[in-house]
Design a protein with these regions (language model features):
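Accessory terminal regions of nucleic-acid processing enzymes
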Residues: 1-397
C-alpha cells in the first residue's frame, strides 16, 4: 500500500474498532481470546480488499496506538509503560493499604477471613462454567478441613510458586529499578464480601502505586496473554486497592541437576542459589543468595551466614526445629512482563454477578448441610475452562 492507501486503511480501521468496542459487552474482556476475536471481527470488513496476512501485519502495527488515541481500554499491553503516568503519587493510598487490619498469612484468622470473602484467587469461577461456580459455593459453605492449617513438604506447583515468587519480585525490581512491598489480604472499602491479596505494590518514587502479579510457570507456555482467571484476579485487586495499573509478570525457572552443572554454566548470569531449610518437618524456609553474586566464594559465605542466622553449627545439625535440607541451583529461563490497566467498565458489569452469588451463599449458610448439593461430582482436573462462545457479544439497546 502507498501512503494514501495506508492512511485510508487506518481511518477505516479506527472507525471499525471504535464502533465494535462501543457495541461489545464489557464482560467479554476477561476472555483469553478477546484480542483474537476482536481482530477477526474487524477483518470481516476488509476481507474483500486484502489478504488476512496483510491485514494482520498492519493491524498489529497500529492497534495499540488506536486504543491509546481513542482512550479505549485494551485488555493488556506487551509494553508495560504504554499508559502509565509516572508522575502520579499514590503515597496516601499506599499508606491506607498498609494501615488496613490484615490477619497474618496462613494463620487460622487468615483462613477464616478468606472464607468470609470472595477473593481474587477464586472469584474467576463465577465467570467460568456452572460446575466451577458450584465449586466456589461449595468451598464457602463446607466446614473447614482438619488439614487446612497444616503446611506440607510437597514439591508441587503451589510450593514451586512459593519458592520462586520472591525471586521473580527481585528480578522485577532489578529490571525496573523500583522497590516492591508485600501486602496481606485487603478487604474492599465499600463491598464487604470482596477482598484481594496483591503479590506486591511498587512503593518507590518511580512507578509509585503500580501493582505486580506474579505467576511462576512450571510447564505451560508463556504467551504474554493473561489467562481468564488471572485477568479477573488482577481486576479485583486493582478495584480493591483503588490503583489503576498492574504488571503481570510470568517467569520460568529451571533447576540444575547439581552444583557442578551450576558452576560449569559460566556465561549465564541470571542464575543463583536458594538455601532450603525445613521447620518442624512441616514447612520450608527459603533463603535467597543475592542476585548476580555467583562466585563460589561468595555463595559459600552466604551459606555460612544462613547457618549463623539459624544457629546451625553445620548443615547437618538442627536447632529449634530448623534444619538444613538442600541447596537449589536455579537459572531464569523466561521473564515476561505485560501491563494490564484497570477496567472499571468490566467490574461494574461483573459486580452484580458477584453479589448475586454471595447473596446465595449467605442464604445457604442458614441451611444445615446445604454445601452437599454443590459438592463437585468428581476430582478431575480443576483447570478453568474458557467460555465456548466468542467474547464479542453485542449489546442490543
Amino acid at each position: 500500500m502507498n501512503i494514501q492507501e495506508q492512511n485510508d486503511f487506518r481511518q477505516s480501521l479506527e472507525e471499525g474498532i471504535v464502533s465494535l468496542m462501543e457495541q461489545m459487552s464489557p464482560l467479554s474482556y476477561h476472555d483469553y481470546h478477546f484480542d483474537d476475536y476482536l481482530k477477526k471481527e474487524v477483518f470481516v470488513a476488509f476481507e474483500d480488499v486484502m489478504s488476512e496476512d496483510e491485514f494482520n501485519t498492519f493491524y498489529d502495527e497500529v492497534i495499540e496506538q488506536i486504543f491509546l488515541q481513542h482512550k479505549l481500554i485494551k485488555r493488556s499491553y506487551v509494553l508495560s509503560d504504554q499508559r502509565f503516568d509516572g508522575n502520579r503519587d499514590y503515597e496516601t493510598q499506599i499508606q491506607y493499604l498498609k494501615d488496613v487490619p490484615q490477619p497474618a498469612q496462613k494463620t487460622p484468622e487468615w483462613y477464616t477471613f478468606r472464607k468470609a470473602h470472595l477473593t481474587g484467587s477464586n472469584i474467576w469461577k463465577l465467570f467460568s462454567t456452572p460446575g466451577a461456580r458450584n465449586q466456589l459455593i461449595y468451598e464457602k459453605l463446607a466446614p473447614p478441613s482438619s488439614n487446612v492449617f497444616r503446611n506440607n513438604l510437597s514439591e508441587g506447583p503451589l510450593n514451586w510458586g512459593h519458592k520462586y515468587e520472591p525471586l521473580s519480585i527481585l528480578f522485577y525490581e532489578y529490571y525496573n529499578d523500583v522497590i516492591v512491598e508485600e501486602f496481606g489480604c485487603i478487604p474492599h472499602k465499600e463491598i464487604p464480601f470482596l477482598a484481594a491479596s496483591p503479590d506486591g505494590i511498587v512503593t518507590s518514587q518511580k512507578n509509585n502505586g503500580r501493582m505486580v502479579e506474579i505467576k511462576n510457570v512450571v510447564s505451560r507456555e508463556i504467551t504474554k496473554i493473561p489467562k481468564m482467571e488471572y485477568y479477573i484476579q488482577m481486576q479485583l485487586q486493582m478495584e480493591v486497592c483503588e490503583l489503576p495499573d498492574c504488571d503481570f509478570v510470568e517467569t520460568k525457572f529451571l533447576e540444575y541437576e547439581n552444583e557442578s552443572d551450576f558452576y560449569k554454566d559460566k556465561y549465564n548470569t541470571t542464575k543463583g542459589m536458594i538455601v532450603v531449610l525445613v521447620k518442624d518437618n512441616s514447612s520450608y524456609i527459603y533463603e535467597y543468595a543475592p542476585l548476580f553474586q555467583n562466585q563460589e566464594s561468595k555463595l559459600n559465605a552466604f551459606m555460612e551466614s544462613v547457618y549463623e542466622k539459624y544457629n546451625l553449627c553445620s548443615p547437618t545439625l538442627e536447632h529449634d526445629g530448623i534444619r538444613w535440607f538442600r541447596n537449589v541451583y536455579w537459572k531464569l529461563d523466561i521473564y515476561s512482563c505485560v501491563y494490564v490497566p484497570r477496567n472499571e467498565l468490566w467490574f461494574n458489569h461483573a459486580q452484580p454477578i458477584m453479589k448475586e452469588t454471595w447473596d446465595l451463599i449467605c442464604q445457604e449458610q442458614e441451611i444445615i448441610d446445604s454445601h452437599m448439593k454443590y459438592k463437585p461430582k468428581s476430582n478431575k482436573s480443576k483447570t478453568p475452562k474458557e467460555p465456548n462462545t466468542p467474547p464479542i457479544q453485542v449489546i442490543h439497546l
